[in-house]
Structures are given as C-alpha cells and as structure tokens.
Regions:
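Conserved loop->alpha-helix
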Residues: 1-111
Length: 111
C-alpha cells in the first residue's frame, strides 16, 4: 500500500521485452528497500526483482502492460517512485494500492 506522495523520480536505464513480460531497470536514489519490495512506479505497484547500487529492476506482466501506460515506457523515460507504506509511517496523502483493475479513455478536456 502507498500514500500517493511521490518520494523520488527514477529514469528507465534499460528495457528487456519477452513474450511473457517486460523488464525495466530504473536508476534511482531510493534507499532502504530489498529485493521483493513493492515500489509504486508512476502509480503502478511493481516488485523489485534485482537491486544494484543506484538501480533496481522490476518485471511488468502482460496483464499490467495491457491495463496501464507502462506498455509505452522506454529507455530514458522518467517515472515517479514511492516505496510501500510501513506501519508507523506518516500518511500525508491517501491510501493507494497500485493494482490497476481497468483503464478509461479521456474523451474531452474543457478549458
């Protein structure tokens, strides 16, 4: 679970695609998380599958690719990052799960 308050921005430094998932490597200054931690990446809950000094990797399933804009993410893109909420953390935003159920289409913007 997340608060929706962006903690950092990361940059996608590498993308690998297969027929089962898309793997992204993100350069970031996030600290104090482990492999297996949930990281909110531009509103999408992803799991850190690898971790290096200032980088981590997350795999995006085909279902998540279909239901989110992550299908358009490419090397060099910046994404918003937030580590998962821990008991005792301040909740200054609102509760966000990061699990996408469906997508909508913006039909009109009025100014």
């Amino acid at each position: 679970m997340f608060t929706g308050i962006v903690q950092s921005q990361g940059r996608i430094s590498n993308v690998r695609e297969s027929n089962k998932f898309k793997s992204i490597e993100i350069e970031s200054n996030l600290k104090n998380f482990d492999i297996g931690s949930s990281i909110c990446c531009s509103g999408i809950c992803l799991t850190a599958t690898k971790k290096k000094k200032n980088k981590f990797t997350a795999d995006i399933s085909n279902e998540t690719l279909e239901k989110t804009n992550s299908k358009y993410w490419k090397k060099g893109n910046k994404i918003n990052l937030e580590k998962s909420l821990k008991i005792g953390d301040e909740v200054s935003g609102h509760f966000v799960f990061g699990h996408v159920d469906s997508t909508g289409e913006l039909k009109e913007i009025k100014k």
